[in-house]
Amino acid sequence: MLLKTSRRTFLKGLTLSGVAGSLGVWSFNARSSLSLPVAASLQGTQFDLTIGETAVNITGSERQAKTINGGLPGPVLRWKEGDTITLKVKNRLNEQTSIHWHGIILPANMDGVPGLSFMGIEPDDTYVYTFKVKQNGTYWYHSHSGLQEQEGVYGAIIIDAREPEPFAYDREHVVMLSDWTDENPHSLLKKLKKQSDYYNFNKPTVGSFFRDVNTRGLSATIADRKMWAEMKMNPTDLADVSGYTYTYLMNGQAPLKNWTGLFRPGEKIRLRFINGSAMTYFDIRIPGLKMTVVAADGQYVNPVTVDEFRIAVAETYDVIVEPQGEAYTIFAQSMDRTGYARGTLATREGLSAAVPPLDPRPLLTMEDMGMGGMGHDMAGMDHSQMGGMDNSGEMMSMDGADLPDSGTSSAPMDHSSMAGMDHSRMAGMPGMQSHPASETDNPLVDMQAMSVSPKLNDPGIGLRNNGRKVLTYADLKSRFEDPDGREPGRTIELHLTGHMEKFAWSFNGIKFSDAAPVLLKYGERLRITLINDTMMTHPIHLHGMWSDLEDENGNFMVRKHTIDVPPGTKRSYRVTADALGRWAYHCHLLYHMEMGMFREVRVEE
């Protein structure tokens, strides 16, 4: 099934993306045979942006995308550190819209989150954003209304530094990755609510069972399958939405359109990678080239040279490469190995290099999920407590409207859950993770990780021991000391929770509509600790303030705006509450945010 899915994804590239890049920051593909709208690169201090609908053809079927200035992605916005900029955003849709400036430090009323920052932009209205640019680097912008981000409302931001940068380069290219579906995103979400593994076509088979028996033995294989079955989970379910429906894009172009970035041999090329996907993690490499990482989430880091790196949804990485040949493939495979985005660095248009095959499909283990050594205990627990619970989820969409009832699947389901087991004895055991009372007997929580750690030096599932040097969070060190300098005065611990079968997501098992705001005192320095009690990886984003990631010993390590939290991990970061107002705090997997993994953070004097 993997080969069929991959081939299908690859063949989608035979048709053209509805939009091409500009001749400025994007490189136009000279082999395009359609007249395509161009996403311009805009720079200065005054910007006019219009959000509307544009016909696109990415897979061979014409669809209506929601676009900014007619482009997918929208225009690259180039600002200068220290400038005050004004952006007039006109809404030509027949629904409310918005733009959030991801990772940008600005006043709360300029942040672009309807219901928190402002009331949103109604049809035919214009909203004027204006703020001073206080940083430099690579960032991006996107809609924060409904599921519009999935439909095309996103683009790149480049902020030129006021002072000389600590590295040299001769040329740059933005490489913006995204995922596109021809389906209506609301229909896609309904399918996930009815059957959370609807898009997972890589489930274990009889053949894989016998392969596991050969490598692990019969008893271990049966015990492993039994545990997964009792938990109503699947070790291949790494991404809720896969290449079965997604086409993976690089600067708006499908794989066979071969987006091309030009260079001259011997030049140092800065590649500004942005993951603007709704749901997809990418593993990126350029066969034949080393990549030197020089910035993460727009902030300078000590240079580290790697062969490959994983980019979580909403993260950005800047790398320097020094190509000497004629053509190199930029290969970005999805974490679940169901497809890829692809482009080329070349000395002229029309060149291409070999495209590597997808890596083998990875499988989650109990250890990955923080369940190491607990398998036999879980296999014998009582899973019956939640069988009669309501499957509606009662979730609220982020624009405040009740989601329609998604119904139930055609087959009756046993809502088994590890959250129903007795953890009272485990809480006092050495190394065992405690959990908030709100998770106990909770119909929105189907598992609890019991043995967690930061895992900062772990490249991640599917990247371990692959023969390549892979970037880890432990490699990332800011080129500056802790900008605040104070030790955190308190710690807020939050658990990332979910119920896979119901496709319900939350913090501490409390859905957004029922959750009280997280209150911060203006000026305080605090620590936020995140514990992942799910089998999914979550990129967590706090608006308006930096997230200063700590190492295992509680020391400042690297400044980011999005923190990746894999299964079975416990990661801490420091926050300075220096921005008054109401701020969004959420998982940046779009459908997880929509289904409840969202909180309001309120900074008050």
UniProtKB/Swiss-Prot annotation:
Signal peptide: 1-41
Binding residues annotated for Cu cation 4, in chain numbering: H538, C587, H592, M597
PTM section of the record: Predicted to be exported by the Tat system. The position of the signal peptide cleavage has not been experimentally proven.
InterPro entries: Cu-oxidase-like_N (IPR011707), Cu-oxidase_2nd (IPR001117), Cu-oxidase_C (IPR011706), Cu-oxidase_fam (IPR045087), Cu-R_CopA (IPR006376), Cu_oxidase_CS (IPR033138), Cu_oxidase_Cu_BS (IPR002355), Cupredoxin (IPR008972)
Sequence repeats: 382-389, 414-421, 422-429
Binding residues annotated for Cu cation 2, in chain numbering: H102, H142, H588
Residues annotated as binding Cu cation 3: H144, H543, H586
Chain's role: Required for the copper-inducible expression of copper resistance. May have oxidase activity.
Protein name (record): Copper resistance protein A
Encoding gene (name): pcoA
